[in-house]
Amino acid sequence: MKFGQVADPSQIDFTLPKDHPKTKEILAKSKGKDFNIYIGCAKWNKTDLKGFYPKGTKDELTYYATQFNSIELNATFYSLPSAEQILTWKEKTPENFKFFPKITNTVSHFRRLINVTDVVTDYATSVQNFGDKLGMVFLQLHDNFKPKDFDRVEKFVKDWPREI
């Protein structure tokens, strides 16, 4: 077995343990607003989710969206999907489903947060097509990004389009 992989995930008992006795007491004292939890994977394809899809599944995303309420959308890291592609994805998912698109690697890895206004504008225009199904976008920096470059992150966040 490779770490983190199993031959047949259908044989795993994913039953959650009982709540700790103090959980109800602590939650009863909470005065916070309601919140939603979104759970999903980084991809929905059959190769990465071996054994997840029932035999004969014709459309992975449609089935995936019956089991999870979100997806960490890695596809946007490599290229920007067309408005038509985003519409197709949206139509295959239920109303409360969210897409959490990763910011393109052109911003994070190639330009390393320098002179990215044009790419960020294109990215923002693209992901706005998710409409109500757009979750939070996120940035994954290169593994050799250093603390000395934090000023780039500050500028990037400051300049980020407010509509996203």
Give the positions of each predicted feature.
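Residues lining hydrophobic/aromatic ligand-binding pockets adjacent to catalytic sites
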Residues: 1-164
